[in-house]
Amino acid sequence: MSGNRKIVIDFKKILPFAVSILLFVVLFIRMFSYKEHISDYIGLSSSIISSKLLTFIVLLGIWLEYTAVLIVVLRPFFEIKTIKNSTKYITPFIFVANLFLLKPSVLLLTGQDNTLLTVLLIIEEALGLVISIYYYVKEFKTEEINYKSILVSLGIFGAMMLASMPVYFPQFVFGLTKLQMIPKSLTPAHRILLYGNILFPVALYFLLRNKSQGVINCALIYISLATLIGYLLPYNYQTFSEPWTWPFHLCNTAMFIIPICLVFKMKRLFYFTYFINVLGA
């Protein structure tokens, strides 16, 4: 038996994972590359784009982009029907549509033309399309098209969008409301917020309790990454030079630690974070 063993690297198998990780890195660089202006708008009529319809379409495209990117990023790591169908039949259309909406998207996000953001968005759309087309071609001959399964995946995709909704979307579309939340008074708006936070994890438990471990892992990783992206949207490159704005609060650090624990299966760190946050609360 020879003492020298050759390590054979199958680049065809590694490539989807490498492109997926690269896409995620590009997304984060893109998010921090500009000072966002989009959260300043209140109602569609306040948009820098003259057409309300185009403003809404672009705003929806930006929202769909976050959902689509996270789905194709997770695709190489999970063989789940919804993720597979979404990657092949839904995300390609989103990436192509956002290429056509590139200029108004940049204008809405920053309030002006931004060459760096434009280039990063093009790279992001291209990488997303590469992954989507790769899996469509790869599975074209081996898997039959099941229209019922695609419709179910489309419905689940809609539910997945809730986790990736940008925080500025309701304000931009509907404007400000007359409802007020007084911290020490259980107003209707305050009750909805409290009950929603209590019911969501309970509902999620019952939805996932009979699913495979792969589905559970995928769902939790997706939710944690989507909410992390939503949390990071107001930040930009200047944040790194302003330590007083860094997320050192326990609840804020948990936004970063939970995805790390789920992705790398770090149970001890998870329970330590859980204990510290409960103690802090």
Predicted regions and their residues:
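Extreme N-terminal leader/anchor segments
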Residues: 65, 105-176
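Alpha-helical transmembrane segments of multi-pass membrane proteins
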Residues: 22-38, 160-171
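Hydrophobic cores of alpha-helical transmembrane segments in multi-pass inner/ER membrane proteins
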Residues: 60-73, 121-138, 191-205, 252-264
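Membrane-interfacial loop-to-transmembrane alpha-helix junctions, especially the N-terminal start
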Residues: 12-20, 79-93, 146-152, 212-225, ...
